[in-house]
Amino acid sequence: YCKKIHPELIELANQRDDVRVIFLQHPILNETSFAISKMVIAANYQNKGFELHNAIFSSQGALTSEKLEQAIKDSGLNEAKLRIDMSRDETEKILHLSSFLAGGVGARGTPSIFINEYFSGGYLSKEQIINLLK
């Protein structure tokens, strides 16, 4: 559902000044989601975290290694630096902090959406989100 809601959130944020979208890396599925989360965090050292996140979540179908390599290229990342930054202690600490924060506010699954005082632990349509913003 994260891939399904991603373009809707980006569209809302681009259309409305009163909407702010914040992505926390909160891997819960498997080692692959953990590695991809580390990769997105490491991309921030090159100021390309959002670009990589967007490229990954904009890809169609299952994320293959080929699609991931293409997302890295499309994001304009230096891949060698990205691999080094993924192994930094800081990257690991940021990932653990992000998961800690997500868990601390009740996010047990993904996507988790907070709209003012409302919390949804799952997918919401764009229309549902707009109704909650009123």
Regions found by a protein language model. Give the residues of each.
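Structural alpha/beta surface segment adjacent to cysteine/selenocysteine redox centers
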Residues: 3-73
